[in-house]
Amino acid sequence: EPRSCYRTSEEQHVIAVRLAWGLDAAGIQPGDVVANMMPPGNLWVPFISYLGAVEHLDVRVLPIGRAYSAEAALKWMNRYKVNVLLGYPAEIVRVVLEAPAGSTFPQIRLIATSGTPVYEGPKRLLQEAFGNPRLVSAGYASNDTGPMGYQCEHCTTGAFHLQDDLQILEILEIDSDQPVPKGKPGRMLFTQLLLRVVPVIRYAIGDIGKWVDEDRCPCGRRSPRFELCGRTDDMLVGEALQLLPETLDA
């Protein structure tokens, strides 16, 4: 049985504001027209969470969700001159693949995604369809912890600034509770500093990451940066070594 997470309205408000900070850092600008294509309903949180987030930005919002045909989605995007897409990669790709022949695609400036990485094939498909938009992360977050990280324009794929006023991040050795040095991958544990109704303390998110071993980010933000390296269940563990996906040459 899944466990329930409860939040007060004040906690949800702070989470929405922090998500908005992340979207602003990722490149959403005042005056943008944002299509919220996150999945609504079925106890899914992202649609509501990001709808609350964009309300704190000076943008217009089109709440498309995913209960639509590709033809209808493109119709509304073109009618309201959408220039930013916010959603799961698979849902945005589905619109492209299921669009009727001869469909007109809007010129999109920015695609902010969440949930899963955008691999090279889908990335090329989206850039060809929507006029070479910039693809960014909408933020590193989970239903349990809320926002954990955000990307600025200087973050490479998989790298994030820590939401350090909301989270304490520990990166520990794979097989012990010892902290790893900067640049070495380890297990990521988060302690949420906001939630009081259902506290989240040293939560093992299941991701492997490493601290970015560089000086202060060129964007000027002082929050520490980390980079995702994979999942703990993606590791190959042997008697004398442990291999992460990033260490394997395809």
PLM feature spans:
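Conserved adenylation A10 loop of the ANL superfamily
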Residues: E1-T8
